[in-house]
Amino acid sequence: MNTEQVREEVRSWLAAHWDPNLDLIEWRELLTDSGWGAPDWPSDYFGRDLAPQLSSVVDEELARIGAIGAAHSGVRMLAAVTLLAHGNHEQKQNYLRPILTGEHAWCQLFSEPGSGSDLAGATTRADLDGDEWIINGQKVWNTSAHHADYGLLLARSDWDEPKHKGLSYFILDMHQPGVEVRQLKQMNGHASFNEVFFTDARVPRANILGAPGDGWQIAMTTLAYERRSFDRPRNPAGKSPSSAPIYQQYQQELEVANEPYKWYPQRAGRVDLVLQRAKETGAINDPVIRQDIARLHILAQSARWTAQRARAAQKAGKPQGPEGSLGKLAASHIGRLASRVHTDISANEALLTGPDSAMEGVIAEVLVSTPAGSIAGGTDEIQRNIIAERVLGLPKEPRFDTGPFRDVPRNSSPKDQ
C-alpha cells in the first residue's frame, strides 16, 4: 500500500468506528483488533504488516479527528518489541493485545545493586521447580514498577555457565506474593524509580522468553530499543471535547505514565532557559557567557539533527547503528555543559530552591538532576566502549570472567551459591 491508500483506508475506518462516547479500553479494543493500533506490526499479531514509515500516516489521521491511539508509551513498548522478536505464538497472543489496549502496564527488571553497568553480572536467581521458576533476589532503578502488572525480568538460571550464557529472560507477574516494590526518593525531590525484592516469587515455565540461557541476547533487543527515542504519548489534536469521558480517562493514563519523567527536562540541562536567564541577570553582556551560550546551542541543535537522522533511518527500516550511543553521549555532555553555564550565569543563586530562587528552583533542580544523564540507560563509559569496539574496531578490554559464573569474584549474598 502507498501513502494515499493507507490514508484513505484508515480515514474510512475511523469514520465508521471512532466514537468519543466509548470507554477508553473499549475504543482501544476496536482499534487494536482492526490492526490500526499498531499498523507496522505483523497481521497475525494485531498489526497490518505496513512499512514503518507508513505508520505515521495513521498517527496523522488519528490526530486529525482527535481520536486516541493505542497505548504505545514507556516500558509497554519495550515489552512489545521484545515479545514480537522473541516470544512464542501463545505469549504474543496473551500479552500483546493488553499492551495496546492499555490494560496491562509493564516495568523492566534488569539492574541490580551489585550489577548496574555490568548487567551480565546479575545474581537474582531463577531455579526451576517442576513447572515453575522460583525467583529470589533484588532489582533497582525500575521505572513505574509500583504501577506495573508485569515485569521483564533478567535472572540467572545457570551458575555453571559463563555469566552471559547463564541468564534467562522471564515475564513476571508483579501482583503476587513474594514481590515487594519500594519507591526510591531522589536528591531532586522526585521518586521516579523503585527497588524490587523477590522472595520465592514464581514464574510459570510457559513465561520464559526463548530457551534457558537466551536471556542476554533477548535483553540486547530490549536495550537496543530503549536507547532509541521513544514516541511520547500523544495528546489528541483537532476535535477534542475534553468533557467526554474517554478524554478524561486518557488524561489520567497520561498522568500516571508521565509522572516518572517530570524532571527529565531538568536532567537534560534546560538549554531552552539559558538565554532567558542570561538576559534576566545581565550576564548576556559578558562575552565569555555569550560564547558559552552559542557553543551550547550549536551542540544542542547538532544533537537534534543527529536524532532526526536516526529516527528517519529507523522509520525506513534500517538496522540500528551507533546512533543510540552517540546520541546518549551527546545528551549527557550537553546536560553537563548547560548545568555549568547555568551556574556561571546565576552564581550562588543557582543553589537556592523555593519561590524566590532562580526560576523558582528550576535551576537548582537542573544542577542535581543532570548527573543522572551520564549514568541511566548505560553510563558514558559504556557508550564509549561500544563506539570504540563496534564502530572504530579497537581491541576489546581484557576480561577475567569467562569461566563459570559461580567462580567469578564478586560481592555475593548467602543465596548466590
Segments and roles (model prediction):
Residues 179-300, 373, 411-417:
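Glycine-rich beta->alpha junctions and the first turn(s) of the following alpha-helix
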Residues 124-127:
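A structural signal for short hydrophobic beta-strand segments in well-ordered beta-sheet cores
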Residues 279, 283-290, 301-357:
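C-terminal helix-coil-helix/basic helical segment that borders enzyme active sites and/or dimer interfaces
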Residues 131, 136-182, 194, 218:
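A short core secondary-structure module
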Residues 1-74, 93-98, 261, 280, ...:
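Amphipathic, small/basic residue-rich leader segments at the start of a protein or domain
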